Amino acid sequence: MTDKIKGLLEIKKSGITEYAKFTNRSQPNISNKIKRDSWNVKDLILLAKMTNTKLSFLDEDNQPIIFLNEKDLEENND
């Protein structure tokens, strides 16, 4: 997962340092996530927001059927 996150950040001309700042987390905290490859849904939703992309589930025809966004974090208190 870490490679995909880094790849998206690179495509969007950003990096892990900017992601840490965007999420109000310390650089060591993000470095630990990278080392452990321990990303959660909240991390991915915030990454999507930062990179102006969408996080979704696609059906077998590649049609989006569910989108995840910050409202989902509020509903679940994550």
How does the language model describe each region?
Residues 1-7:
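N-terminal-biased segments
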Residues 9, 20, 48:
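The alpha-helix within a helix-turn-helix
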Residues 42-58:
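DNA major-groove recognition helix of helix-turn-helix/homeodomain DNA-binding modules
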Residues 3, 13-15, 39:
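Residue-level signal for the short linker/turn that defines the boundary of a DNA-recognition helix
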Residues 13-31:
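Short alpha-helical DNA-recognition segment
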Residues 56-78:
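Short, charged recognition helix plus adjacent turn
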Residues 6, 31-32, 45, 59:
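Key DNA-contacting residues within the recognition helix of helix-turn-helix
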Residues 26, 37-38:
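The DNA-recognition helices of helix-turn-helix-type DNA-binding domains
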